[in-house]
Structure formats: C-alpha cells, structure tokens
Curated annotation (Swiss-Prot):
The gene is KRTAP22-2. GO terms for cellular component: intermediate filament. Interacts with hair keratins. This is Keratin-associated protein 22-2. It comes from Homo sapiens (Human). Belongs to the KRTAP type 20 family. In the hair cortex, hair keratin intermediate filaments are embedded in an interfilamentous matrix, consisting of hair keratin-associated proteins (KRTAP), which are essential for the formation of a rigid and resistant hair shaft through their extensive disulfide bond cross-linking with abundant cysteine residues of hair keratins. The matrix proteins include the high-sulfur and high-glycine-tyrosine keratins. Keywords: Keratin.
Amino acid sequence: MCYYHNYYGSLDYGCSYGSEYGNSGYACNFPCSYGRFLLAPRKKF
C-alpha cells in the first residue's frame, strides 16, 4: 500500500525513507518506490 510519509518537512511517497532503518529502502513495493523516485528525484535513495 502506498502512503504519504513526511520526511524532513516534505511529503514523500511510498514506504518510509530507507536510511531511517539503515537499509536502501527497497523493502517497500516497487510501484510506491518508483512513484516516490519520480515525484522526488532530488532525494537520496
């Protein structure tokens, strides 16, 4: 399931930001991750 995740005061899409848990963040489902990448390309993944 996709959901909005607030990270450093800005909306993020998909699962929680990976580095919060010390991993790359790919544990979330791909469509959510890919959508987040498209919507916030300036963020580090």
